[in-house]
């Protein structure tokens, strides 16, 4: 643990639509703390509704940071988020207050606690080169390249794992070191593991599935179509993370009149449920036993489970 790691932070993890944001606001009010986005999709601008960013009413109830601050034309790494959080925690007006980290991106939580190796930044030129080759040649061809240049990591990757193959080649070219070597470098913690309150929301699966369906229908009614229309007007690379947000492909198909409204909503709901299942599985398998599991945000406050860190 770093000596500068923030003590008494609150960490709230859980699948999408599980009630994390409402719990974070309630905790911010109880502690006088501030909320920090810990979700890799909610960093992008334009998609307020489809990424379920806090509403204007939510923003009025508590201070929120690192939401929608990244243009959808950009990529944004865990390392960049780590840097932004570090800068945020150093602000004079926030020091001494309780940071409440809330979101569904497991790697962000791991990075906060020092459990993620600090990966090097890769230049846009190198990234574009290898991603262009991946698109042109395919995963098997680039896996063969990796077998020659870095046989150790190539042996650990499936020949079809295009994302990790490209990442390994990018890092090797940028730094001259294998990704395996970078992964051995211990991460630096921004949050003190021992004093942090670590919470995982794990709601009933049927309840969550219904909530996801209701929420996406509300997104549609409140302007998700306009969001996607604005995103498409930017004429972005389909490979960018923002273009892969759940609902973008389905709403785009609706706008192109290749999919009905009902089918677009149904497919988006199914994709969101599948994503929530993957998130829940990750949290169950990857977070330590010191993370306390609750079925709902309300349960956190029942029976004196929540302690004010101030």
Swiss-Prot record:
Region (Interaction with substrate tRNA): 39-42, 163-167
Top-level taxonomy: Bacteria, Pseudomonadati, Pseudomonadota, Alphaproteobacteria, Hyphomicrobiales
Marked site: Interaction with substrate tRNA: 105, 127
Protein name (Swiss-Prot/TrEMBL): tRNA dimethylallyltransferase
EC class name: transferase
Keywords linked to the UniProt accession: ATP-binding, Magnesium, Nucleotide-binding, Transferase, tRNA processing
Family, as annotated: Belongs to the IPP transferase family.
UniProt-listed Pfam families: IPPT (PF01715)
Disulfide bonds: none
Naturally occurring in which organism (per UniProt): Brucella suis biovar 1 (strain 1330)
């Amino acid at each position: 643990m770093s000596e500068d790691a923030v003590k008494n932070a609150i960490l709230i993890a859980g699948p999408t639509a599980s009630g994390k944001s409402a719990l974070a606001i309630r905790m911010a009010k109880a502690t006088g703390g501030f909320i920090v986005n810990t979700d890799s999709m909610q960093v992008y601008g334009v998609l307020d509704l489809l990424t379920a960013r806090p509403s204007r009413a939510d923003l009025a109830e508590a201070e929120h940071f690192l939401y929608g601050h990244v243009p959808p034309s950009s990529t944004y790494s865990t390392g960049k988020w780590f840097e932004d959080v570090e800068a945020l925690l150093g602000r004079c007006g926030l020091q001494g207050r309780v940071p409440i980290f809330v979101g569904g991106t497991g790697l962000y939580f791991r990075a906060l606690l020092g459990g993620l190796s600090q990966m090097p930044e890769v230049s846009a030129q190198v990234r574009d080169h290898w991603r262009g080759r991946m698109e042109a040649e395919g995963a098997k061809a680039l896996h063969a390249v990796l077998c020659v240049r870095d046989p150790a990591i190539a042996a650990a990757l499936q020949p079809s794992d295009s994302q990790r193959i490209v990442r390994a080649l990018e890092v090797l070219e940028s730094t001259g070191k294998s990704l395996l070597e970078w992964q051995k470098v211990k991460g630096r913690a921004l949050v003190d593991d021992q004093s942090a309150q670590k919470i995982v929301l794990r709601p009933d699966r049927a309840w969550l599935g219904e909530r996801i369906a209701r929420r996406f229908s509300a997104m549609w009614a409140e302007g998700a179509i306009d969001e996607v229309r604005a995103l498409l007007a930017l004429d972005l690379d389909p490979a960018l993370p923002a273009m892969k947000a759940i609902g973008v492909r389905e709403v785009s198909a609706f706008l192109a009149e290749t999919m009905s409204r009902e089918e677009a909503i149904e497919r988006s709901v199914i994709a969101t449920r599948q994503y929530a299942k993957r998130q829940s599985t990750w949290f169950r398998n990857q977070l330590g036993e010191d993370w306390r599991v609750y079925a709902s945000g309300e349960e956190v406050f029942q029976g004196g489970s929540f302690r004010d860190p101030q």
